[in-house]
Amino acid sequence: MRKLTLCFPYYCNAGMLRLQFERIRAYGADVLEQLAVIVVDDGSPDGDAQGEPIGCPLTIFKIGVDVRWNQDAARNIAAHHATTPWLLLTDIDHIVPHATMAAILGTERPAKHVYRFERRTLERDGDLSRYKPHPNSWLMTRALFEKIGGYDERYAGFYGTDAEFRDRVNQHAKIVMLPQWLIRVPRTVVPDASTTTYGRKEPMDAFGMPRVTAARALEGAWTPRRLTFPYRKLFESPC
């Protein structure tokens, strides 16, 4: 039985996706037989994310519109289609080392908690340097993701929405920091590791997100909006 689905968004990251697939294939049978991977292209204008056999089930979806910073919708789609009890939600520029993945799959943890990871940065010379934990990488059960409500797609188009999701995580679960780490890949190592198409922390983010929050508050007993964007399946491979 497969235990975990690794979920990450894609946006014009062909080189980084190839590196992800290379690292996943290298896990070995003991990990791959428990793993599935879902990639969601959140509207890349330069072509679709390309799939290939990676040794475990791989599914790729693509959102049909190109919206600034729409990785929240991508994560919702991935979680919706996952069939494993556990999810690992992260970004495409974060690699899960074999030791971390083996520890995740080989350890029974309370399903009532949500888990975060330490982080290292991959340097150009291959060394790893300590880096602050990623604020939007999560290990949790699919059932708990549903209870939290997933990501609220009202905030589509804004950078920094991970804080809103984290606030709701704190309302439903204890967050536990694990000693294992993820590896951040900067653009100095892989040029398309992360997007340069859209700016981060723009004025529209500072002013727009509070307006969405205020409008949402008027709804009273609101629930997060999910699966609001059209999408299609691009690729599926059993292994």
Specify the residue positions occupied by each region the protein language model found.
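Short, well-formed alpha-helical segments that are part of the catalytic scaffolds
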Residues: 13-28
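C-terminal catalytic/acceptor-binding lobe
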Residues: 19-20, 163-239
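Acidic donor-binding segment of Leloir-type glycosyltransferases
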Residues: 24-65
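Glycine-rich, basic loop-to-helix element that forms the pyrophosphate-binding segment
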Residues: 65-81
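Short aromatic/hydrophobic "clamp" motif used to bind/position activated sugar donors
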Residues: 87
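Acidic donor-binding/catalytic loop of UDP-sugar-dependent glycosyltransferases
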Residues: 92-107
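Short beta-strand-to-loop element that shapes/binds the nucleotide-sugar donor at the catalytic cleft/hinge
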Residues: 115-129
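Donor nucleotide-sugar recognition loop
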Residues: 149-167
